[in-house]
């Protein structure tokens, strides 16, 4: 009887040690990439609505205006036409606008893009992993990424055309 109780306690102790060890390993040894102002922007790979691969690191040498948005978001809806209007001018100057939708259906996003005739790359953050990495709250939230791939500013909330143009000027190479 005492042997069974001792064996049971040893097994419980081993399970607890294993759980603590696993927790420590997860916390200290697995490094999850997070966005930090002044640091290199966390890379991501998505497929845009036209089936083209977008990988952030491919835009080194260009400024990137990274916008997180949703079709249901009224402030997002208001600023999209301004981004669309400014896109050709700043694309010529070496600035890319990338809009990442907050994990909605393809049909909802495609309808929105068609309705506003958006010309810049639009993709869906399936599963919301990129939003988590960038710590996005609320929508819209945008990030200015310079030609060296560093995040230089986070912008929360709706922007006017004039504000957007100032931000695009900041990241023009």
Swiss-Prot record:
One of its GO terms (biological process) is cytochrome complex assembly. It is a single-pass type II membrane protein. Residues 35-173 form the Thioredoxin domain. InterPro entries: AhpC/TSA, Thiol-dS_OxRdtase_ResA, Thioredoxin-like_sf, Thioredoxin_domain, Thioredoxin_ResA/DsbE_sf. Gene3D superfamilies: Glutaredoxin. Pfam families: AhpC-TSA. Thiol-disulfide oxidoreductase which is required in disulfide reduction during c-type cytochrome synthesis. May accept reducing equivalents from CcdA, leading to breakage of disulfide bonds in apocytochrome c; following this reduction heme can be covalently attached. Pathway: Protein modification; cytochrome c assembly. Disulfide bonds join 73-76. It is found in: Cell membrane. Its main location: membrane. This is Thiol-disulfide oxidoreductase ResA. The gene is resA. GO terms for molecular function: antioxidant activity; disulfide oxidoreductase activity. The chain crosses the membrane at residues 10-29. It comes from Bacillus thuringiensis subsp. konkukian (strain 97-27). Keywords: Cell membrane, Cytochrome c-type biogenesis, Disulfide bond, Membrane, Oxidoreductase, Redox-active center, Signal-anchor, Transmembrane, Transmembrane helix. GO terms for cellular component: plasma membrane. PANTHER family: THIOL:DISULFIDE INTERCHANGE PROTEIN DSBE (PTHR42852:SF6). Belongs to the thioredoxin family. ResA subfamily.
